[in-house]
Amino acid sequence: MLGIRAMLVMLDYYWIQLITNNDTRSNNTDTIFVSLLTGANGVTRTAIGGLHSNYTNLTEAFRFTPANTTTNSSTEGNWSVTNLTESCINRGESYLTTIWLLNCADNNTYWYSGNAYNHTIDTCKNTVSGYLFFGMCQLWKDWVTNASHDTVRIQSLGNEIRCMLLPRQYTLNATVEWYNKSEGDVPEEFMDYVILTPLAVLTCGLQEAYILDKGRRYMYLFSVSCAGITGTVSIILVSLSLLILICYYRCGRLLICPRGFELLPEFTEEEEEKEKLLTYKDIEVQVPIRTRRLLVPWIRESKMWVLPPPLPPRPPHLIEFPPSPPPSPGPMHMVVCMPA
């Protein structure tokens, strides 16, 4: 298993390098999206990626809500979800998502969609404004100018996993479908992350979370099926072994008991002494006593041991051979008489 996992990690790294080298680096670093994904057992995943700036009709088509920033103060820290108010983050038994759209060059307005964060309370609005414009914007700018921008960065920050996507501009339609919808076809722009990495966290998206859950569920069912098959085969083998042992000890070295079989009594001491006194001639005349341990009554009394009746004598006319044909005459000499 460790070897297979190491091979998958190497394939993942090679595939990320391949798709990155085939794409051009985005020059626009101002318009970004930030996603928040929460789930059961305290699962929290965030993602930052580039976005095309020419999106329109956010309210009707994509159901985004505009919001104004309420603070301009910067907050020091590592800029994780710990900078947000914990009571503002909604958690449940199923996955909850929120997507924020913002232009880092214009820190007056941002758009949000989803139910993973509560935007109805003023305190929540204040913390999310600083989190987005002073935290996520700075992280994205540092990431784009970083020398290792051609790979996906996965950061583990306590109970949070943050995914820094490749510095490309994703369309809003693909972003909403990947981060805010649990079902549907994988968008073509995010297909590169799924082809060879179906069981790895690379984008922190909602569809990726469901793909991971399905993969783990299938692996669990496969392991349970293997355990069930192994247990069933083990039970069958143990049952056959017990049956063979019972037949061996019950039937006296015979694995298949004949019908009406009964064990003969064991030898007594007197019979043992008599057996020792037998001579070679006695053994020729009678059946040795020791063979009683192997022979069974049904063999002696079976009809297969009775000789068939002798055939009647052959009639005399069948015994006599027919007379041989007479020998063929010898060659004749021809005499020719000539007149004088």
Curated annotation (Swiss-Prot):
Positions of glycan attachment: 27, 54, 57, 68, 72, 78, 83, 107, 118, 146, 173, 180
Membrane side Cytoplasmic: residue ranges: 247-340
Top-level taxon of the source organism: Viruses
GO cellular component entries: host cell endoplasmic reticulum membrane; membrane
Record-linked InterPro entries: UL20
Residues in the signal sequence: 1-25
Record bears the keyword Transmembrane: yes
Keyword Membrane: yes
Lumenal side: 26-225
Ranges annotated as spanning the membrane: 226-246
Subcellular location: Host endoplasmic reticulum membrane
Keywords: Glycoprotein, Host endoplasmic reticulum, Host membrane, Membrane, Signal, Transmembrane, Transmembrane helix
Membrane topology according to the record: Single-pass type I membrane protein
Family: Belongs to the HHV-5 UL20 protein family.
Protein name as annotated: Uncharacterized protein UL20
